[in-house]
């Protein structure tokens, strides 16, 4: 049985304590996964945040650290807790109360979507779930933790920007949503400054509505310890053509914004940390 690929880790090459996370852009579907897809590959691709890994290229080229998940969200969702399992989708799992996301098919292993219905021909064996957790989910979070802890030990502060995309918004709706779990995963000034930088770049922005942040920012954000985590959601209409897969004329603009956020927020963290260290 082949191993799942490890997360792609880009080490820092600049002196700003910012780590980018891209958990939902994996496109590495194995033969076994596709063979079990009840509605074909397209049904699994609808779970992706298309090309968000490529949106991060400018920031990575500028030296920012990043962790990118090559394994598709359909296989296992790194933005869910290990316990968010739909027992109807996994064999050998005892029925237990589940959260609303797992109940609606979008738990640790997605089982159905509103558009395509049931995703899998057969239930996934519990041993396979354990394999995915051990080879995909945990290594991703270990890489995030290691990067953030290293930054915090060097600079006294660290920031995680967890990058996602959202379905096209209606005309006039914000193209960007910044999530900080209602002030629990980052200091309020961090998300406020992220919103300001996005507005200065010409985007309409909302805070925590409708996406307040998932398991990644909830797990890794510890603002009381100087480790901040925000979720960045960009509307797909801002960087993709109408087919939802092809980069549009706005692609480079969004890539530039991610670099701007990393630079501006990273410098702001250092500016705040230095006076505190001198006291």
What are these regions (language model features)?
Residues 1-160, 166-230, 234-279:
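N-terminal catalytic or cofactor-binding beta/alpha core of small enzyme domains
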């Amino acid at each position: 049985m082949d191993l799942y690929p490890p997360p792609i880790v880009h080490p820092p090459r600049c002196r700003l304590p910012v780590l980018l996370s891209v958990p939902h852009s994996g496109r590495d579907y194995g033969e076994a996964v596709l063979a079990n897809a009840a509605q074909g590959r397209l049904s699994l691709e609808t779970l992706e945040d298309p090309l968000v890994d490529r949106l991060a290229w400018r920031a990575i080229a500028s030296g920012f650290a990043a962790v990118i998940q090559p394994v598709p969200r359909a296989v296992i969702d790194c933005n869910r807790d290990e316990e968010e399992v739909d027992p109807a989708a996994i064999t050998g799992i005892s029925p237990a109360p589940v959260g609303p996301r797992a109940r609606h098919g979008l738990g640790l292993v997605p089982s159905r979507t509103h558009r395509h219905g049931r995703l899998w021909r057969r239930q996934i064996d519990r041993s396979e779930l354990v394999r995915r957790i051990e080879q995909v989910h945990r290594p991703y979070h270990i890489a995030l933790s290691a990067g953030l802890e290293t930054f915090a030990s060097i600079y006294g502060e660290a920031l995680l920007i967890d990058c996602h995309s959202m379905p096209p918004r209606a005309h006039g709706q914000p193209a960007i949503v910044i999530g900080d779990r209602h002030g629990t995963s980052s200091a309020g000034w961090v998300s406020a400054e992220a919103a300001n930088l996005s507005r200065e770049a010409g985007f309409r922005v909302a805070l925590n509505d409708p996406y307040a942040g998932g398991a990644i920012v909830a797990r890794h954000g510890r603002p009381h310890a100087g480790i901040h985590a925000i979720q960045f959601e960009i509307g797909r209409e801002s960087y993709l053509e109408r087919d939802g897969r092809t980069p549009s004329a706005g692609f480079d603009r969004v890539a530039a914004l991610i670099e701007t956020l990393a630079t501006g927020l990273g410098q702001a963290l250092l500016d705040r940390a230095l006076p505190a260290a001198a006291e």
